[in-house]
């Protein structure tokens, strides 16, 4: 146990996009960190494409050059990290890079209930990265919602409401204002920013105080 009974409870803000394979890993791996440190967590859906457009357009150049050694090694490391975490990974598939606007809006529609959002997020990650399904397909996403007991059609309807669109935009802008440049962006106690699955040991250390 990394936290004493009278220690202040640390807060983790986890900005994420369902299209990111590294976020799939981090979302699953961070659960143990949260349990160990007894931190409170806020799951914050955002649109990583909006982040890239604002502050990290070099990502698109890298995607355009698939023979770049860094890109090749990143895919190798990605699968090694998945094996280390004992997570199934079917990636990349024909759906990559997937448009994530629809699923991220659906996440925003659930943000008021963090436990339900967490369950939906896991189911959506599994659909895309473990099962190779297209999360830009409304039928797939309705099925994902139904798999955890939600009304898929109702959630799809909520996802196109102006307030939900505004929420996704606001989350993305907030993440950018805090220094985000990709997914996942993890912020401890609204102060320390961490990025990526490989920085989870640092997140653990920061949360433990």
What label would you give each PLM region?
Residues 1-2, 106:
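Short, charged low-complexity linear motifs
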Residues 3-44, 112-115, 119, 123-209:
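C-terminal cap of thioredoxin/glutaredoxin-like
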Residues 24-128:
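Structural alpha/beta surface segment adjacent to cysteine/selenocysteine redox centers
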């Amino acid at each position: 146990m990394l936290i004493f009974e009278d220690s202040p409870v640390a807060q983790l803000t986890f900005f994420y996009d369902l299209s990111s394979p590294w976020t799939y890993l981090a979302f699953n791996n961070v659960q143990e960190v949260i349990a160990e440190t007894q931190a409170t967590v806020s799951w914050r859906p955002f649109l990583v494409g909006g982040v890239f457009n604002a502050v990290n357009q070099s990502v698109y150049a890298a995607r355009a050059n698939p023979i770049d050694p860094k890109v090749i090694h990143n895919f190798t490391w990605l699968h090694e990290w998945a094996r280390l975490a004992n997570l199934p990974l079917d990636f990349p598939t024909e759906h990559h890079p997937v448009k994530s606007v629809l699923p991220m809006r659906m996440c925003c529609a659930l943000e008021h209930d963090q436990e339900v959002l967490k369950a939906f997020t896991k189911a959506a990650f599994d659909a895309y990265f473990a099962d190779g399904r297209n999360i830009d397909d409304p039928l797939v996403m309705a099925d994902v919602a139904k798999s955890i007991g939600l009304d898929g059609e109702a959630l799809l309807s909520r996802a196109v409401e102006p307030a939900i669109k505004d929420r996704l935009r606001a989350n993305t802008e907030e993440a950018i204002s805090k220094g985000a440049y990709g997914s996942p962006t993890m912020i401890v106690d609204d102060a320390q920013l961490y990025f990526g699955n490989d920085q989870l040991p640092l997140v653990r250390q920061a949360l433990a105080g």
